[in-house]
Amino acid sequence: MDLIPSFSTETWLLLAISLVLLYLYGTYTHGIFRKLGIPGPTPLPFVGTALGYRNGFYVFDMKCFSKYGRMWGFYDGRQPVLAITDPDMIKTVLVKECYSVFTNRRTLGPVGFMKSAISLSEDEEWKRMRTLLSPTFTTGKLKEMFPIIGQYGDVLVNNLRKEAEKGKAINLKDVFGAYSMDVITSTSFGVNIDSLNHPQDPFVENTKKLLKFDFLDPFFFSILLFPFLTPVFEILNIWLFPKKVTDFFRKSVERMKESRLKDKQKHRVDFLQLMINSQNSKEMDTHKALSDLELVAQSIIFIFAGYETTSTSLSFLMYELATHPDVQQKLQEEIDATFPNKALPTYDALVQMEYLDMVLNETLRLYPIAGRLERVCKKDVEISGVFIPKGTVVMVPTFTLHRDQSLWPEPEEFRPERFSRKNKDSINPYTYLPFGTGPRNCIGMRFAIMNMKLALVRVLQNFSFKPCKETQIPLKLNAQGIIQPEKPIVLKVEPRDGSVNGA
């Protein structure tokens, strides 16, 4: 029996041509970096170098940095990506040529109306969003929001007290995750939730569904490798952000906005109210003001960008304090001197705390919120003698940069003194990028820092943290997407003086 089908010569020829064309399509871009003399791993047809992500993005970046030096090229599917670590090149990409060449981030895939969110919008639409939203994050507005965050600092202390009284070790992600969710949902949607004690609340459930996001999920990976599938997914009504979840938040914002517009009394200052105010400002041209759907998109992206990052950063920081008790004690001494007798923190005093700033900065060096920064090259350009073709994604491997031993002696060590007044002036600002930099840096950076500092002060006024038998030492990272600990960070929590000052 013949194992080879009996096709005509024309059919075989057509099949051969189709296979050749398919191969050429899957490899067409893969010679770009070789022609430019830029080193990097060897790509495979269609998948490029994406199989190198098996152990995580940042493990891949560290290996490439070690093997190829300060610049290398690789391929996410057919997409050429140029990794740069030279501070001058980074400055050019993120600052100098931001508006002209490197304005946009890579397109994520089928995102629907979320395309108007400030993190995902492009070119003139992004500039418009940034202009509209920047006043929301001024010092004055953050001061007005400070009491809202403060009340959840009290909830955090009370929740920790209940757990500490049980005498059991505490999973930090549970308590800091609840704090982060409470603050974000309160400031973005105007709702008050004690999420740790009300896990069935619709806002809690939908926020957690929104954040079930894995960069190595087959759906996301298929978009990464085959971006041309995006229109197909849109036709099939398949979205990166779950439609049921975005519909829930859209209806919630519409309901909240309607309620606030009906009630003429003065409302508290939060992101939702500030965005509503911008819609109704007489100084704002109608075509420039936020539409209702754009307002919803910003509220959702605040949750997406702020929840996981804040809770994870706080967990990492507490781990470092628990394993460096001398640093923890020194920070508590600064807190006690700044706010005697467990006085409630104030915004102005918080921003003046030098050692608190040092500890937070060093934590964000070791565990940067954004392990990678990306910009798409809009036209052919030459930077520092390197030609970058149009369509190339230029990537700054922040995690790798922050652990470069030529910049940070003994980079794996936790040393807040790196950021002392004496030392921080010697740090090149383009080698320390936990929130990015330039016109398209994280718009919520100052809010996130304030949020974390307030939580740290309230917690350390009342508790000390110590390792226990469940604590993983040394800490191992799960680098699939956002940097996370491989296992939950579990610590023993002890009241400092036997009494806890809560709400």
From Swiss-Prot:
CDD domains: CYP3A. It catalyses: an organic molecule + reduced [NADPH--hemoprotein reductase] + O2 = an alcohol + oxidized [NADPH--hemoprotein reductase] + H2O + H(+). It is found in: Endoplasmic reticulum membrane; Microsome membrane. SUPFAM superfamilies: Cytochrome P450. It holds the Pfam family p450. GO terms for cellular component: endoplasmic reticulum membrane. The keyword Transport does not apply. It is an enzyme of class 1 (oxidoreductase). Induction: P450 can be induced to high levels in liver and other tissues by various foreign compounds, including drugs, pesticides, and carcinogens. Disulfide bonds: none annotated. Keywords: Endoplasmic reticulum, Heme, Iron, Membrane, Metal-binding, Microsome, Monooxygenase, Oxidoreductase. GO terms for biological process: hormone metabolic process; oxidative demethylation; progesterone metabolic process; steroid metabolic process. Heme binds at residue 442. Belongs to the cytochrome P450 family. This is Cytochrome P450 3A12. The gene is CYP3A12.
